[in-house]
């Protein structure tokens, strides 16, 4: 592997498999049992106008990347550093070949991203959401728990938990009817527990806080 610690330390956990052509740039923390495939780039600076490494021309340092235990990052995946919060890939996530995780995006546990899916900056994805191949999200989007996004969809607004959406722009098609979701095909907010909506509300609160900080940084 190629390691760049110019702007921060690279920490690799136990029992990881990292191909020699992968590029790891700090600040970066990788948990245990993580797979990083050929030509993956993890920790590159944010794609945003401004100075390296922060990307907004401010004195604030990059917030880095956290890859949690058991994540699988396939060949040619890109994961960029956060600017105001760490970019996070959660436990047991599967990022298929060519997926792009933009700066400040955060993925919960068990998220699946199809090949060549692209997240806009600051995207938040809750646990066990699934992206088909070629999905694109608008910056600042929130994807709820166990949501299903159909292939080649363009997601321009938040997706509620357990929803199934597809299209360009993506539209609600019903519930995620996969066996592990255990919902009827017709989507209704009343089907979901209070705890699911509480999780979704916490994501929204986190996003509003980040938007306030971002506005301050961008005009300071």
Predicted regions located by residue number:
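Amphipathic alpha-helical blocks and their helix-capping loop/short-beta junctions
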Residues: 168, 176-187
